[in-house]
Amino acid sequence: KPGTAERYLQNNYITTAKALEYFEKSVSAAVNNDLKARSMYMAARCLMNRQMAETRIEIAKTGTFEFGYFYIDSDVWKPKIKSLLATNKWIKSLQNFAPQTRFHQIMIRECSLYNDYFGENSESVFF
């Protein structure tokens, strides 16, 4: 019988695995670059959900949390988060593809999370 952590990682609500599957199909089927960039971004977010779920389990197992709050900004976890972002294939694809799209220009202006990952200062912040 799988343990709590394994059951947590099998929960589609937590990992968004099914959504990732559909966004990956959408990337392949996209009829224009903006739709392709949007699909890549959503696939990247889905993969990040999975990666963060795995990180939360690791944090819980190592006891590096207090009162239910995870210290993801701590010196212990910053390198881990950076390495997760570096291994997210959709973030890498989006970094190379999106800057030429209208979607990218809108998201840089409207979404602070997107700007953190793909804006002018993203290289120094995450990679």
Regions found by a protein language model. Name each.
Residues 1-127:
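Acidic, polar-rich low-complexity tracts and alpha-helical solenoid repeat scaffolds
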